[in-house]
Amino acid sequence: KNYSIFNKRVGPDTHIIRYGEGMANTFTVLEQLSWAFENKNIEKNTWYYSPKEEARNDLGIRNQTLELLKKIKIFIITVGLSEVWYNKENNQVFWKAIPANKFNEKKHGFKLSTVEENTNNLHQIYSIIKKYVPNASVIYTLSPIPLMATFRPQSCITANSVSKSILRVALDNVMSKNIDKKDLYYFPSYEITKEYFTDPFKEDNRHLKNEYTLKIMKIFEENYCC
């Protein structure tokens, strides 16, 4: 079907390819789009692929990201976390938890983001894409992968339920307010996993079994790729 396939080893040097699956909150998705399209100033030394690998914030990567984004016809944006770590000094939200050797209690904080914050971010994500790539479509999805841990003083099971619920309500807010848009969609991968399949997860109880991933992708293909 003439699709371009990129991964960490193949394709342009961009963070959304190298670490796209780690950008699971709405703040970081919006930040990458604002950085690429609008040259938003981002504080250095705040992006991490892993505890030992810092992601570069330089003009070369930004330009490659911009060129890649301008060519996209369909943006598939999956969100999964409403629990976030952030910079107390400027409210910048990080991709993931701060590496232990970089953590500063006075500077770094943890919070459960709100429905309102995520609704606003999702609206802005759609708006900035349409501003700079007007012919593109946007498909939002909610990741069914549950939290592995929480920094809230409660069970990870209950924290995950709250985290997903916040995002699902935010997504519903955006879709309800843009019901007339013909280029904005929600694909229910979360609901298919939770409500349709009876035993979809691997032994780790977090990641989908391969056959269920293929079933979901088949449903997606039938609705969006034909």
Give residue ranges: language-model regions.
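Extracellular glycan-modifying ectodomains
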Residues: K1-C226
